[in-house]
Amino acid sequence: DGTISIGNNAGKNVTSADGSTFVGSGAGASVTTGGKNTAIGYSAGNSTTTAEESVFVGYFAGYNATGSSGAGVAIGSQAGREQKIGSSVYIGRMVGYKHDGSADYAGGNNIGLGHQTMYGIKRGAAGNIAIGRSAGGALDGHDVSNEASWNVFLGYNAGRHVTSGSYNVAIGSHYAGGAMYNLKDGNQNVAIGYNAFQGDGSDGQKPELNVMIGGGAGGGGSLMKTPSHNVGIGYLA
């Protein structure tokens, strides 16, 4: 069937996973059916039973990914661990790792790249792009259609604490707070610049249809009290 297994218990339970490659101790050890998988690394893809056309590379990458993890990619130590990876791409250490032990998996079509990017994404959050360390690290779809979905976060800590907002674009890096760093909710906002439209971390605020461009633009102050249809351009605008 063209399956290659190298390592202690690698692919040991395979019954019909044609064209798969399992390399490393415990790699793909629980895969039974579903072909064309690649699992390389200690326990990569382990406890994943019916994945198909998926790629898991790294220590515990794709470990315990669910049965519908078809055509997903998880590369990096613990990338995509405990996650429903279907059609998503997680690259980097702990990217897309759903670490709370629940069965509240993320939706599909997410792209995460960077150290702990999308760390903890869950409950149906789908179609997001997060690039940069800790970007998009709290996305929680609450199993509601289009919640915590279709966001773009680019930069270190961009959108770090956004939980349920959708259709947002945040571009900007900062070690203590990237664009939309402390904003928990809100839809169709654009923030460009370090610390732009940070929010103050409080619950109940739901800004919509704002554009903030510039370092610190929008901030967490007065604009957050009138959160819709604002435009701010310039440093601390």
Say what each PLM segment does.
Residues 1-237:
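Glycine- and small/polar-enriched repetitive beta-structure motifs of secreted/surface proteins
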